């Protein structure tokens, strides 16, 4: 069948429909919610503010997302916690690029935080020829070492009963590091060094796998930061901006100092 997906598109304030823009997806896979804003706020760094640098930024739901849609929609990812939303993210860009001439479907970025960090890394590794750049923050890249109240609840356990009637449960969720050899695009991994929600070990496991696969990638470690980046969030924004501008627009003329941070 056909499943409608709902989302929001953010454009630069000086948008010109005769121009062609790279597209970035801001993602959060759920399954308890989706990263689709229903209102405006002054803190929209990852969507509206990012668009002002010359991007089309979209947030769109995916099957396996918000439970208000339906029980089937919400449960779509059960048993496949890594991959369930990736196809919808790819198809979203393909359909939008086919519909709107101002979207460059060959210059696609993806970004997310926490579950979105997990998803954005999975996307650039699962579809390495499609997603050209990713910024992945505080991602639970290995849900086998993440909180069981999240991973077990949303992925499930495999129940096995032996001949004696004894029941055992097996728990094995596909990880991002297992896909490290697939990397072709440009990946920036970001984590706080004292994240007390998603342990930095999740990101370190991906780093280890990428190094052993002889891949070039970038890392941003934010000292003293937990799951949110607090007083380093502005610095993070400009590092994310540099990454996408360099690899999707080709504009990388910035000096060592981030002069924008000195503006009032």
What do the predicted segments below correspond to?
Residues 1-264:
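Serine-hydrolase catalytic core recognition
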């Amino acid at each position: 069948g056909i499943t409608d997906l709902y989302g929001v598109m953010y454009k630069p304030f000086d948008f010109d429909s005769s121009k062609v823009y790279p597209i970035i997806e801001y993602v959060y896979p759920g399954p308890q919610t989706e990263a689709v804003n229903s209102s405006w706020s002054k803190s929209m760094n990852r969507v509206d503010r990012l668009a002002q640098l010359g991007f089309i930024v979209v947030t769109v739901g995916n099957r396996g997302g918000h439970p208000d849609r339906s029980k089937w929609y919400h449960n779509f990812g059960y048993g496949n916690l890594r991959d369930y939303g990736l196809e919808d993210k790819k198809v979203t860009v393909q359909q939008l690029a086919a519909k709107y001439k101002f979207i460059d479907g060959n210059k696609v970025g993806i970004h997310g935080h926490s579950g979105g960090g997990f998803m954005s890394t999975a996307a650039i590794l699962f579809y390495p020829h499609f997603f050209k750049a990713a910024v992945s923050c505080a991602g639970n890249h290995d849900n086998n070492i993440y909180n069981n109240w999240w991973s077990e609840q949303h992925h499930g356990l495999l129940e096995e009963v032996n001949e004696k009637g004894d029941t055992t449960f097996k728990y094995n969720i596909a990880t991002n590091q297992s896909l490290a050899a697939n990397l072709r695009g440009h990946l920036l991994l970001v984590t706080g060094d004292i994240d007390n929600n998603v342990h930095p070990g999740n990101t370190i496991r991906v780093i280890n796998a990428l190094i052993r696969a002889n891949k070039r990638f970038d890392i941003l470690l934010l000292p003293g930061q937990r799951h949110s980046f607090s007083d380093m969030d502005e610095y993070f924004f400009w590092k994310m901006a540099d990454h996408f501008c360099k690899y999707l627009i080709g504009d990388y003329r910035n000096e060592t100092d981030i002069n924008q941070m000195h503006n009032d």
